[in-house]
Amino acid sequence: FSGRKLDTTKWDYQIGTGSQYGLNGWGNEEAQYYTPKNVFVKDGYLVIEAKKEEKEGKSYTSGRVRTMKQDGSPLFTTTYGRIEASMSLPEGNGVWPAFWMLSADESYGTWPLSGEIDIMESRGRLPNRVYNAIHYGQPWPMQKYTSSMYKFPAGQKTTGFHEYAVEWEPGVIRWFVDGNMYYETSSWWTMANDAVEPFEYPAPYDKPFYILLNLAIGGTYDEYRLPNDYD
């Protein structure tokens, strides 16, 4: 990343609580309000900073960016390939950083029918491990997911810089940390509510996806934990 601000020809902000999509708390009962002020570039790195401050009914502010404009038009999408980032993650209760992908056009329907690829997620209170997932199946609440965990070698933590990557090919998705593949799957399906059979495999992972980076606070992912005052 260059300069001091987000390059909005490549990335754009998502703002608010998710209420504009009918998902207050971004569908996970999260405790933050996303603002552009919590995202900046420093020394060549993109920084997302969470703060304890009240904003429009939320107790924290933080940041979320994606390779899609606020109006929903794409800035960057990909179908297949290797997607990677070198990241240093925060430690502490209630912090939930994520590096992930969503369908650019929801070809198969709204979440989770068109899929979600979680390249990396972390629970800040467990700084020696990260997680991945794919989401698919039928409409909520009958959705499915497949997930795995990577545990760092002794002496390493998520607070150091590590490379997180996914390799996405027709019919297979693989996850890597620091070049080490730790999980792969070819098992998924997706089906509309009124359908008799699923969409043709490898749906939904055969359409363009865009990239997201965010730092959430609280919510369902780690049982509603919130940061301690000293975190």
Which functions belong to the PLM regions below?
Residues S2-D231:
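GH16 jelly-roll
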